[in-house]
Amino acid sequence: MTIKRALISVSDKTNLVPFVKELTELGVEVISTGGTKKLLQENGVDVIGISEVTGFPEIMDGRLKTLHPNIHGGLLAVRGNEEHMAQINEHGIQPIDLVVVNLYPFKETISKEDVTYEEAIENIDIGGPGMLRAASKNHQDVTVIVDPADYSPVLNQIKEEGSVSLQKKRELAAKVFRHTAAYDALIADYLTNVVGEKEPEQFTVTFEKKQSLRYGENPHQEATFYQTALPVKGSIAQAEQLHGKELSYNNIKDADAAVQIVREFTEPAAVAVKHMNPCGVGTGKTIAEAFDRAFEADKTSIFGGIIALNREVDKATAEALHNIFLEIIIAPSFSQEALDVLTAKKNLRLLTLDVSAAVQKEKQLTSVQGGLLIQDLDMHGFDDAEISIPTKREPNEQEWEDLKLAWKVVKHVKSNAIVLAKDNMTVGVGAGQMNRVGSAKIAIEQAGEKAKGSALGSDAYFPMPDTVEEAAKAGVTAIIQPGGSIRDEDSIKKADEYGIAMVFTGIRHFKH
């Protein structure tokens, strides 16, 4: 079907003028509104004003201009339906064959820190979605464009074939409904947050494609990376890649895990992650010292790992990193000398990210077959006001440092989780075992002689005193755990028996 008449009304005017000029050269009549009409006329394009079509002025500060039978009748009339065509002829309605509309910038408006509620409401588009939906419903007869990126493909098809194919119209219609659904979801989310609704009867979210991925967790799985419509400061989706191969699905998950851990620390810290579990964490007076400790924590598992640091990478740290095979290094920045060292490895991925950014109170979404689980992110850190010491002995100064490190790290280890820390570094990590004492044995075995004098962190309480027994045999001198078991007293007695200082936090950190 030849395009004879187009309705154009856009907020994003990117590449609009040359596109419309070419349409008019092909004999297309253009109807337009407001600022779009003004722009086109200023650039020498003949335009029919929307009021000339509706016979009604634009009113209410532009809130009401396209909601009219002369517009929607021209969009919805099925060309092959004799009754439809007779009705629009009877009422003097002319068919519209092409709709080019994009919407008021609601997302950009609410992204502003100083946005008012009134500003947000005024940027909710009404007429635009109405036209887009009407045209998309009737896509067998109407071509609809919501994205400036589609100007050239549509124009080329019109030039080459004289019309737009049904397949292309379907693709464009599907894109429109995705776009309007995302637009409405963002509005719904904004208003839901304004009124403070915690558990709405429908949960609507919108994500935007960031990049295609080669494959998913395994080569036979397809995958894509999407990011939240509103950027989350300090999130892995906001990281900038400076160097190296394209990120993989597993890279992104591991990098996210590393960022979440290193964010727990204010002092210089380095985190090494493999398969979303930390294999080495260290802190120090400098970032080089912190990385040296993270490396010493587990020299084997760090191979092929992901490193996150919370200070600029300097030359000394870069040289230490360069000596190891790593997949990714994430840091707030890299000195030029560090980049000169690290970019010598062409495949090493270097990412910059403000890992110190305050974590926003996002919801954590976990898919299950046929459903979605939603919970608050576990943002609870070490809080002196919540701790209690049930044992006879209290931790000494160094034990306190190691207990805090173990507690910050164990929160991010797959349950059941046990972490041993000593001298400002992890020395053993026991992850993902079906019983707690099993995880403790793994952490102790990994630590070896370093278990002596170490501090043990547990993500949940001890149902029996066997973990304390294993820790004592290995030389652990301090333990931090939530407490709360009906058999806490058994573990306390066992700790007192061996002179172990035990701290209760009152907070559990399961991670499934």
Swiss-Prot record:
SUPFAM superfamilies: Cytidine deaminase-like (SSF53927), Methylglyoxal synthase-like (SSF52335). InterPro entries: AICAR_Tfase_dup_dom_sf (IPR024051), Cytidine_deaminase-like (IPR016193), MGS-like_dom (IPR011607), MGS-like_dom_sf (IPR036914), PurH-like (IPR002695). Pathway: Purine metabolism; IMP biosynthesis via de novo pathway; 5-formamido-1-(5-phospho-D-ribosyl)imidazole-4-carboxamide from 5-amino-1-(5-phospho-D-ribosyl)imidazole-4-carboxamide (10-formyl THF route): step 1/1; Purine metabolism; IMP biosynthesis via de novo pathway; IMP from 5-formamido-1-(5-phospho-D-ribosyl)imidazole-4-carboxamide: step 1/1. One of its GO terms (biological process) is 'de novo' IMP biosynthetic process. PROSITE patterns: MGS. Residues 1-146 form the MGS-like domain. Its EC number is 2.1.2.3, 3.5.4.10. GO terms for molecular function: IMP cyclohydrolase activity; phosphoribosylaminoimidazolecarboxamide formyltransferase activity. It comes from the Bacteria. It catalyses: (6R)-10-formyltetrahydrofolate + 5-amino-1-(5-phospho-beta-D-ribosyl)imidazole-4-carboxamide = 5-formamido-1-(5-phospho-D-ribosyl)imidazole-4-carboxamide + (6S)-5,6,7,8-tetrahydrofolate; IMP + H2O = 5-formamido-1-(5-phospho-D-ribosyl)imidazole-4-carboxamide. Keywords: Hydrolase, Multifunctional enzyme, Purine biosynthesis, Transferase. One of its GO terms (cellular component) is cytosol. The IMP cyclohydrolase activity resides in the N-terminal region. Belongs to the PurH family. This is Bifunctional purine biosynthesis protein PurH. It comes from Bacillus subtilis (strain 168). The lineage of its organism: Bacteria, Bacillati, Bacillota, Bacilli, Bacillales.
